[in-house]
Amino acid sequence: MAAIPLQREIHYPESDGKPMAESDVHQAVMFDLIHALKTRYSGEPDVYVSGNILLYYVEGNPRASVSPDVLVTWGIPKGRRKTYLLWKEGRSPGFVVEVTSDTTRNEDLRKKKDLYEQLGVEEYFLFDPLDDYLRPRLQGHRLLDGRYEPIPPSIDGSLVSRTTGLRLKPEGENLRLIDEATGERLLFVDEIDQELARLRKELGRS
């Protein structure tokens, strides 16, 4: 009887060796977006928010990966993951943001856009915080019959995300998230710190 070869376990690396962000500005935008979205969905156990995590989309092929800067997936549990294995999660992200730059323009505008379309990512946004090349510097795409169509901008350059119910609006080097239903602005991390400091100061006076 012929020996049955042992199936080798395939390793899916947690890092692709690339820097997390092009600059401190790009990193800050990513961090603020992820933090704001995690806060928004903190009470919903089946909404996963992350960023800069390697997403593997072909089982058995560790080269088939992409690392979204910011992602939200509905219908999978919260929890820390080392990697995002699409065949195990069973769902693609529904919302992705790439904080783009002149260095990553070809990948963000072509390769990632085509891939996210194929993977069924419902909404894909690009934001160029340093105004390197993208005109306008916030752009969005939404799936329609399996193909991406541009999301029309408002007069102020903002875009509405149907998946999150948020308006995305450039503010200087930042990308503000605003609840479309209530008009509430999701705070950046430093704004939360400032508000806490203000409250502590007021409590100290009382």
Regions found by a protein language model. Name each.
Residues 49, 70-72:
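Generic preference for hydrophobic
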Residues 1-22, 36-39, 55-68, 75-95, ...:
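C-terminal interaction segment
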Residues 48-50, 125-128:
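A structural signal for short, well-ordered beta-strand segments and their strand-loop junctions
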Residues 43-55:
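A short acidic/basic microdomain associated with nuclease active sites
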Residues 122:
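Short acidic/polar active-site loop segments enriched in Thr and Asp
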